[in-house]
Amino acid sequence: MNTKLTVLCFLGIVTIVSCGWMSEKKVQGILDKKLPEGIIRNAAKAIVHKMAKNQFGCFANVDVKGDCKRHCKAEDKEGICHGTKCKCGVPISYL
């Protein structure tokens, strides 16, 4: 039960950071205070950092909401998600 609650709280924090309601720096500070030094803290901080960099709704090379395509329409280019970043007219080289 405790593990499930911890995971649920962490996912909530990641959501708050990715939406921009709280700064990444503030969440990183909270993680530094609450988690012991080690692999768990480093993994949690890495996940928060990656999610905070989310741009135009891109997640794991998928344009979840179509924001990347809409963003690149202004340039008359195709919007392609590269991880969590949106790039206009730049195909993914490793596919």
UniProtKB/Swiss-Prot annotation:
Disulphide bridges, residue numbers: 58-81, 68-86, 72-88
InterPro entries xref list: Long_scorpion_toxin_alpha/beta (IPR029237)
Alphabetized, the UniProt keywords read: Antibiotic, Antimicrobial, Cytolysis, Disulfide bond, Fungicide, Ion channel impairing toxin, Potassium channel impairing toxin, Secreted, Signal, Toxin, Voltage-gated potassium channel impairing toxin
The BetaSPN-type CS-alpha/beta domain covers 55-94
Q: Which residues form the signal peptide?
A: 1-19
Highest rank taxon of the organism: Eukaryota
Gene Ontology terms for molecular function:
potassium channel regulator activity; toxin activity
Subcellular localization, per the record? Secreted
Q: What is its main location?
A: secreted
Q: Name one GO biological process term.
A: killing of cells of another organism
Q: Provide the tissue specificity.
A: Expressed by the venom gland.
Q: What's in the GO CC field? A: extracellular region
- Tell me which family the UniProt entry assigns to this protein: Belongs to the long chain scorpion toxin family. Class 3 subfamily.
Supply the name of the protein: Hge-scorpine
Q: Lineage of the native species?
A: Eukaryota, Metazoa, Ecdysozoa, Arthropoda, Chelicerata
